[in-house]
C-alpha cells in the first residue's frame, strides 16, 4: 500500500514522502491516526496544496518540543516512595509516576514520552530518565527516588 506521510515517522520517512507500507500498518495505524493518507492522484494534489501549512505545523511542534527540552534539561525531580530497609521499594516507580511528577513541577510531559529502557524503578537512588518529546528531540531529566 502506498501512502503519503503527513508527519515525520521514525524508520519510515519525513513529511511528504511517498512510501510503501504493509496494508495492515497503513489501514490500522497510519491512516486512522492521521499520520498518512493514501497516495491517490487526488490526495497527492490535495497534499501539495497543503504542504506549506503542514510543514509550518511540523516546525511549530518541533520548536515547542525543543523549548520543553530546554526547560527539562535544568530540572531535577524528587519522588517519594515507601521502601524497605535495604532501599527496595514496595511497588515501583513507572512512566506514569515520572510524568505526573514532571507535570507537577511545571513542564507538561505525557506518559508516552517517558522512556524507561530497563523497566520500572524498584530501588531508592538517582536515575537519568530519557524523554522522547518529538521524533527529533530527546531530553534527559534526573529523577531522585527517596524513601518515605
Swiss-Prot record:
InterPro entries: Ribosomal_bL9 (IPR000244), Ribosomal_bL9/RNase_H1_N (IPR009027), Ribosomal_bL9_bac/chp (IPR020594), Ribosomal_bL9_C (IPR020069), Ribosomal_bL9_C_sf (IPR036791), Ribosomal_bL9_N (IPR020070), Ribosomal_bL9_N_sf (IPR036935). GO terms for molecular function: rRNA binding; structural constituent of ribosome. This is Large ribosomal subunit protein bL9. GO terms for cellular component: ribonucleoprotein complex; ribosome. The gene is rplI. It comes from Ectopseudomonas mendocina (strain ymp) (Pseudomonas mendocina). One of its GO terms (biological process) is translation. SUPFAM superfamilies: L9 N-domain-like (SSF55658), Ribosomal protein L9 C-domain (SSF55653). The keyword RNA-binding applies.
Amino acid at each position: 500500500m502506498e501512502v503519503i506521510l503527513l508527519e515525520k515517522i521514525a524508520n519510515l520517512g519525513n513529511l511528504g514522502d511517498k512510501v510503501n507500507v504493509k496494508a495492515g500498518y497503513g489501514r490500522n495505524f497510519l491512516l486512522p491516526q492521521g499520520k498518512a493518507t493514501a497516495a491517490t492522484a487526488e490526495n497527492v494534489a490535495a497534499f501539495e496544496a497543503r504542504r506549506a501549512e503542514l510543514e509550518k505545523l511540523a516546525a511549530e511542534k518541533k520548536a515547542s518540543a525543543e523549548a520543553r527540552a530546554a526547560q527539562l534539561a535544568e530540572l531535577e525531580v524528587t519522588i517519594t516512595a515507601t521502601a524497605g530497609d535495604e532501599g527496595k521499594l514496595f511497588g515501583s516507580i513507572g512512566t506514569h509516576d515520572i510524568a505526573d511528577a514532571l507535570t507537577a513541577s511545571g513542564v507538561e510531559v505525557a506518559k508516552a514520552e517517558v522512556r524507561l529502557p530497563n523497566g520500572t524503578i524498584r530501588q531508592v537512588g538517582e536515575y537519568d530518565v530519557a524523554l522522547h518529546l518529538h521524533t527529533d528531540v530527546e531530553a534527559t531529566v534526573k529523577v531522585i527516588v527517596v524513601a518515605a
